[in-house]
């Protein structure tokens, strides 16, 4: 199986001023492309050669294959979750109901999610995920890990590796 770059559903400058075109060019065009290339070079001849990204991330031991597969999966979810002109500024329908049920309010969720992202030491990801019973969870995952390793389904991912925000926000992770 050959892993490919996800196609962005928006122009590289469409997320400005929140995420600059320069950041998209480097983050998507350079960092993610490198992870895709690395994964395509690592998996031939291994038990993961014909596995999808979720399976690799859920089952591979720590190491180069896991790290690169994790970053391809994480970045694919990350870049595809954005919309330059969202229809709503807050979740609606079932997700809104679940957030209210599990966090009390959307504002409480934002506070908890932001605290997780800002409080993650070093590089990694903050995630909103759902378990098999429909309960929402906020997790912090180091480096290229993903909640699928714990049997969760990721719904929203926030990249707190410095390459995701440093060109626009420098050392101000919380502003990102």
Residue ranges of model-derived segments:
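Feature for soluble, non-membrane regions of globular proteins
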Residues: 1-176
């Amino acid at each position: 199986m050959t892993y490919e770059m996800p196609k962005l559903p928006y122009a590289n400058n469409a997320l400005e001023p929140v995420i600059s075109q320069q950041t998209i060019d480097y983050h998507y065009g350079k960092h993610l492309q490198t992870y895709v290339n690395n994964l395509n070079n690592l998996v031939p001849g291994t038990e993961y050669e014909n596995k999808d990204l979720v399976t690799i991330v859920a089952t591979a031991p720590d190491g180069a294959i896991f790290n690169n597969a994790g970053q391809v999966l994480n970045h694919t979810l990350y870049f595809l979750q954005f919309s330059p002109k969202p229809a709503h500024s807050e979740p609606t329908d079932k997700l809104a109901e679940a957030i209210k049920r599990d966090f009390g309010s959307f504002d409480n969720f934002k506070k908890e999610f932001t605290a997780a992202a800002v409080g993650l030491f070093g590089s990694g990801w903050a995630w909103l995920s759902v378990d098999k019973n429909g309960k929402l969870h906020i997790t912090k995952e180091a480096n290229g890990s993903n909640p699928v390793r714990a049997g969760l389904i990721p719904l929203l991912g926030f990249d707190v590796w410095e390459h995701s925000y440093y060109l626009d926000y420098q050392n101000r992770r919380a502003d990102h």
